[in-house]
Amino acid sequence: MKRARGGAEARAKLVHPHAWIWEALEDDATFVLGSMFGTRIAYLDGLLMLCFATKEEPWHGILVCTERGQHASLMAQFAPLAPHPVLGKWLYLSESADAFEKVAVRLAAAAKARDPRIGVIPGKRRSERP
């Protein structure tokens, strides 16, 4: 017997490939996992912290939500980070980086520890047009 595709059973099995990274943040009382432009984004204290993308490069890794003034110090501490080629205000850790897993864990720990270089205030949502 064939099963219908896309049912509750199929949805239940879909796990984001970067879920293991944000799991370290889930026990924080302020943690919220949202969606933005086809990505998953972790909020702490209402701030955008880390964005998880699983599409084609350059949208296949982690974007660190930060201000441009913080780029140099974050790139020095987390060597594979670089400005995102499209969204240059944020830093990017490509999943293809040799140290992706190690750096991803360190970034999540820094976000959880409230590293002041990580996190931006979300922009206001535009109201829907009538």
PLM regions: where:
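Residue-level detector of alpha-helix boundaries and kinks
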Residues: G6, T30-F31, S96
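Short, structured beta-strand-loop surface elements
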Residues: E67-E128
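Intrinsic disorder/low-complexity segments enriched in polar/charged and small flexible residues
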Residues: W22-A24, G61, Y92
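Short, compositionally biased leader-like segments
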Residues: M1-A24
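Short acidic, Pro/Gly- and aromatic-enriched capping/linker segments at domain boundaries
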Residues: E23-T39
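Short, conserved beta-strand/beta-arch hydrophobic-aromatic motifs that form part
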Residues: S35-V86
